[in-house]
Amino acid sequence: MTRVKRGYVARKRRKRVLQLTQGFRGAHSVLFRTANQQNIKALRYASRDRARRKRDFRRLWITRINAGARKQGLSYSQLMHRFKKCGILINRKVLAQLALLDTKTFNQLVFYTDL
């Protein structure tokens, strides 16, 4: 049987994994086996946290809207009910930015729902 010269195939594969784990602490960026395990774990966390990030931002927006609404003497749910009843279709992200950065406009929107 003839000898198979693999050349740089294994080195290339290991180098690719080690490049992905640059910046990890300790052996996780130096030793191939632990680096490979950490890379798999990091990818798993990344896919999980993409969904979690959407949840977290929605939660933050609701908290900010609630804070702005309570300054007007309303709860978050009462405010959103009024918006829906009046046909105001502004998403939570924009409402949160208004409540945080442009309180005058946010207060006018809340006042408009009273009419």
From Swiss-Prot:
Top-level taxon of origin: Eukaryota
Keyword rRNA-binding: yes
Main location as per UniProt: plastid
Pfam families (alphabetical): Ribosomal_L20
Signal peptide: none
GO (cellular component) term, any one: chloroplast
GO molecular function: rRNA binding; structural constituent of ribosome
Compartments it resides in: Plastid, Chloroplast
InterPro entries for this protein: Ribosomal_bL20, RIBOSOMAL_L20_CS, Ribosomal_protein_bL20_C
SUPFAM superfamilies xrefs: Ribosomal protein L20
Alphabetic keyword roster: Chloroplast, Plastid, Ribonucleoprotein, Ribosomal protein, RNA-binding, rRNA-binding
GO biological process: ribosomal large subunit assembly; translation
Similarity field: Belongs to the bacterial ribosomal protein bL20 family.
Role description: Binds directly to 23S ribosomal RNA and is necessary for the in vitro assembly process of the 50S ribosomal subunit. It is not involved in the protein synthesizing functions of that subunit.
Descriptive protein name: Large ribosomal subunit protein bL20c
